């Protein structure tokens, strides 16, 4: 895939994270920009005694030139847009982002399944304060037992919690709408077993590190799932 589309190794193409942060940009431009920043910052971040003043000046100048050259070429940051929109107007009906790019689907490993997220702020039921962030996620194609239940809903949950933290709000409800919902033939027995489990453990609680100030600074260790009780695993085969 990467060779065919002349993309960096490991790239998924025009999908999810890339589309969220660099909507409309060319991947090659973004990758060249990132590699240039890494090169120049390597010199700038080194201790003074390991980098000559000339090298440091060269790196600073190169950094400025790269930023100027790529100004306006790195696409539209949809995540910043949603956060800034809700910060300015919590009642906005335009706080949405999308992963769906019909013009670049042929250059994605898989066209985005969870396609659009809409964020709605509602009042707190107790105080009446407008500070509860809800999310409505639309999914164009739903592998229900595997994709939706074990990945897509978690993604929407994490987005809701992280954006709420940026806005000083509380996470509220998550709504999911799906089209083309399906169960693959090689998942029917496993799904039947899953549905037979009528008594589920209590729901766990997701806690985020309150010291993280920027949504871009979260790391794996900043998420804590409390009270998770796992039932015996069910092995699903990946449908190809």
Task: Label each PLM-derived region with a short phrase.
Residues 1-240:
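Terminal, non-catalytic protein-protein interaction segments that mediate quaternary/complex assembly
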């Amino acid at each position: 895939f990467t060779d065919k589309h002349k993309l960096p190794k490991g790239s998924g193409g025009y999908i999810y994270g890339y589309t969220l942060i660099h909507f409309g940009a060319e991947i090659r431009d973004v990758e060249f920009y990132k590699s240039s920043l890494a090169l120049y910052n390597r010199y700038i971040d080194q201790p003074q005694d390991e980098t000559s003043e000339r090298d440091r000046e060269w790196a600073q100048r190169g950094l400025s030139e790269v930023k100027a050259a790529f100004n306006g070429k790195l696409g539209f940051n949809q995540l910043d847009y949603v956060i800034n929109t809700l910060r300015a107007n919590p009642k906005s009906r335009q706080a949405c982002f999308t992963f769906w790019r019909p013009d670049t689907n042929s250059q994605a490993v898989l066209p985005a399944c969870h396609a659009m997220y809409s964020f709605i702020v509602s009042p707190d039921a107790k105080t009446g304060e407008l500070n509860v962030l809800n999310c409505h996620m639309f999914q164009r194609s739903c592998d229900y037992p595997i994709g939706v239940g074990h990945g897509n809903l978690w993604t929407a949950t994490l987005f809701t919690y992280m954006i709420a933290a940026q806005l000083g709000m509380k996470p509220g409800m998550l709504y999911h709408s799906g089209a083309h919902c399906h169960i693959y033939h090689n998942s029917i027995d496993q799904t039947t077993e899953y549905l037979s489990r009528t008594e589920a453990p209590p729901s766990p609680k997701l806690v985020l590190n309150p010291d993280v100030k920027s949504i871009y600074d979260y790391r794996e260790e900043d998420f804590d799932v409390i009270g998770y009780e796992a039932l015996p695993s069910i092995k699903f085969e990946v449908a190809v």
